[in-house]
């Protein structure tokens, strides 16, 4: 065996190693995509109302204060499991009523509590956001958040 590495040996090791890790990366990317689309996301329940609720979530900047499954700001509570915490995850009508009542009667002046803005949402928008939060609550997320309180 030679003690000196030639340029061609170094080049072959570099290209071979690069190709190996590129193939590993592509395989893991394909696996992640397949897992997300086929296992973790329930696309069958992704209705127009859920999509509209996600759109409202984005345009109203809810993520600037709240988190969903750990993504977002930590200024206000996690909402990924809010329907389970409220006990309304089995009833879309109860979820709608609970969300609407909560957002319309935000308590003010409580020490240590931040005030949520009033968004002047219509019933259709409340329904869409509650459907989005119900859908988010149904995601198989490997027990995230780690506590029931979010």
What residue spans do the PLM features occupy?
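Short cysteine clusters
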Residues: 62-65
């Amino acid at each position: 065996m030679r003690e000196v590495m030639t340029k061609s040996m170094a080049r072959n090791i570099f290209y071979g190693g690069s190709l190996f890790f590129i193939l590993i990366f592509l395989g893991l990317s394909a696996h992640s995509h397949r897992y997300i689309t086929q296992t973790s996301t329930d696309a069958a329940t992704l209705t127009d109302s859920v999509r509209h609720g996600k759109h409202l979530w984005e345009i109203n900047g809810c993520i600037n204060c709240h988190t969903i499954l750990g993504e977002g700001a930590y200024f206000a509570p996690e909402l990924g499991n809010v329907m389970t915490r409220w006990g309304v995850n089995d009833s879309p009508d109860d979820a709608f009523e609970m969300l609407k009542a909560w957002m319309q009667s935000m308590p003010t002046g409580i020490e240590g509590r931040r005030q949520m803005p009033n968004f002047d949402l219509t019933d259709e928008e409340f329904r869409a956001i509650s459907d989005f939060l119900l859908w988010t609550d149904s995601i198989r997320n490997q027990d995230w958040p780690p506590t029931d309180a979010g």
